[in-house]
Regions:
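N-terminal, leucine/charged-rich tether regions that mediate assembly and partner docking
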Residues: 1-102
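Extended assembly-interface/linker segments at domain junctions
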Residues: 76-165
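Short, charge/polar-rich alpha-helical segments
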Residues: 161-175
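Non-transmembrane amphipathic alpha-helical segments
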Residues: 173, 177-194, 210
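Short, charged, amphipathic alpha-helical segments
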Residues: 197-208
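Charged, long alpha-helical assembly modules
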Residues: 208-214
Length: 214
């Protein structure tokens, strides 16, 4: 289990419709909440008021939401909607009916709108595993460090950057690598279909150029 300090326990049940009732969202997204989610509990609040930790410059609180699912998966659109509606950094604990669970977190930055809004940059999740196998690093000097440790722990190998690099730079580097991977896949598919030898050679040179950036 996550073994979060008892002082952080909040334990408030949140009605599913709270996340979309006043928003202009499609009936399909509403159906995701109805059909894929059984129960949402705001389980913990990680903050200087609930833990022995200093304030951060960019992170004031981390909210933990325990979501019990009706089936095996939760569509990412539901998580994104919840993440965007809550003006704090969020850690999701998703639990399947069989008791297996995973953690999900999005690296998010304050939007330049002045209304406490956030912009989601990149989302990460652990593999599905037994609940007692889920652990979080809670040793940090301040809330910024705690948040960074959680994101890095959840992301694991999906974050292609050394720990010495800032989290912001690490996320941007990972996004750039994923963009290059998509471009390479498209170019390789085009080269397989291309009949013209000169165009094949041109595509091959572009593939080599992008591979050099990986």
């Amino acid at each position: 289990m996550l073994e979060l300090p008892k002082t952080t326990e909040f334990g408030r049940r949140v009605p599913k419709q709270k996340f979309y009732e006043h928003l202009d969202v499609s009936s399909e997204v509403k159906r995701l909440f109805v059909e894929q989610i059984r129960l949402i509990t705001w389980s913990n609040k990680l903050s200087p008021q609930t833990m022995n930790i200093a304030e951060g410059q960019t992170v004031s609180e981390i909210e933990v939401f325990h979501i019990k699912l009706t089936g095996q998966e939760l569509d990412k659109r539901a998580l994104e909607l919840m993440d965007k509606q809550i003006p704090y950094h969020i850690l999701f604990l998703l639990e399947r009916p069989d008791g297996t669970a995973r953690l999900s977190v999005s690296y998010k930055e304050a939007a330049q709108t002045g209304d406490n809004a956030f912009r989601l940059r990149q989302s990460y999740a652990t593999p599905w595993q037994r609940m007692d196998e889920l652990h979080l690093p809670l040793q940090a000097l301040d809330m910024d460090g705690l948040y960074e440790g959680i994101v890095r722990a959840v992301a694991g190998d999906a974050l292609h950057a050394p720990a010495a690099e800032s989290l912001k730079d690490a996320v941007e580097q990972t996004q750039e690598q994923e963009k290059l991977q998509r471009q390479l896949q498209q170019l390789r598919a085009r080269m397989k279909k291309e009949k013209n030898l000169a165009k094949q050679m041109e595509l091959r040179r572009e593939i080599k150029r992008l591979e050099g950036k990986m």
